Regions:
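Regulatory input/activation interfaces that engage signals or partners
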Residues: 4-5, 12-23, 27, 31-146, ...
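Regulatory loop-to-helix N-cap segments in sensory/regulatory domains
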Residues: 157-172
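Allosteric cytosolic regulatory segments
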Residues: 172-180
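Regulatory hinge/linker segments at domain boundaries
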Residues: 185-205, 258
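Short alpha-helical "packing" element that flanks the helix-turn-helix/winged-helix DNA-binding module
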Residues: 203-210, 249
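Recognition helix of helix-turn-helix DNA-binding domains
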Residues: 213-248
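Intrinsically disordered, low-complexity basic tails/linkers immediately adjacent to helix-turn-helix/homeobox/MYB/SANT
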Residues: 251-258
Length: 258
């Protein structure tokens, strides 16, 4: 990428993300999606995490399954679309674009739809399901976090006849490449890399508060529960994350041994 202005804007974005408090991870994620979407003229964006549940070679997705998704802006039929996609995966009717992404797992990569599917794919029901939601093209950055977990940053073109360009692909790739620490923290904020299941909205809210300097009494007031109740919640959450106290939580967040 040879655009000095865009490079400087991306570096400023990295600085902005580094300055956001750990307890504001959700806001930081939305800021990242919104800013990169503006840079590449995407009308919407999402973050998704996937976990490799099995290494069975017979599995067309190589064991990878989506766990959590966050959209910058809601899309029509979001819940119905997601449920239909999951049913299709379980029944073996899998979108060729999804298979292609799964087979690229383990490498930092960025691609547009036309980079990973043949021309015939655009005549399938899978592409029609995109168009039904107003999506005409997508650009995805795949980010490996560890051997079993990946993050996906997707950017959506909601206008017909204007697919993403090679330059826009390079911009998205570069913007995400320097944020290894951030990608890991986004997954941690959802409990993905350490908990057996993603954190609930209430658990994510509690986690954000535990990453501040507030004592449990003030956290209880914020959540509208008693101090005893919040203490129980804290113990359950820390156990789910595999740490024994708030110091252990901070160590986990910073990527250090507890």
């Amino acid at each position: 990428m040879q655009d000095p202005g865009l490079i400087e804007r991306i570096h400023c974005l990295w600085d902005e993300l580094a300055a956001i408090e750990a307890s504001e991870n959700e806001s930081a994620l939305m800021h990242l999606l919104r800013t990169v979407a503006e840079m590449i003229d995407a009308q919407n964006a999402y973050w998704m995490e996937a976990v490799q549940m099995t290494r069975a070679m017979a599995d067309p997705l190589c064991g990878w399954r989506p766990m959590v998704i966050r959209y910058l802006q809601p899309l029509p039929m979001d819940e119905r679309f997601t449920q239909r996609r999951m049913r299709a995966i379980r029944s073996g009717e899998i979108d060729e674009s999804t298979v292609a992404q799964a087979r690229l797992a383990g490498t930092f990569r960025a691609h547009r739809l036309r980079d990973i599917v043949p021309a015939a794919w655009y005549k399938t029901e899978f592409y029609q399901s995109y168009r039904d939601r107003g999506i005409h093209d997508s650009l995805t950055v795949g980010v490996p976090i560890n051997a079993m977990t990946e993050g996906y940053y997707g950017f959506l073109r909601m206008r017909e006849g204007e697919p993403f360009t090679e330059k826009q692909l390079q911009v998205a790739h570069y913007a995400m490449r320097g944020l290894t620490w951030f990608h890991r923290q986004v997954l941690l904020a959802h409990g993905v890399t350490v908990a057996g299941t993603p954190l609930t909205p209430r658990e994510r809210e509690l986690l954000a508060l535990l990453l501040t300097d507030r004592p449990e009494k003030l956290i209880a007031e914020e959540l509208g529960v008693t101090t005893a109740t919040v203490h129980t919640y804290v113990r359950q959450l820390l156990r789910k994350l595999g740490v024994s106290g708030r110091n252990g939580l901070i160590s986990l967040w910073l990527g250090r041994p507890a």
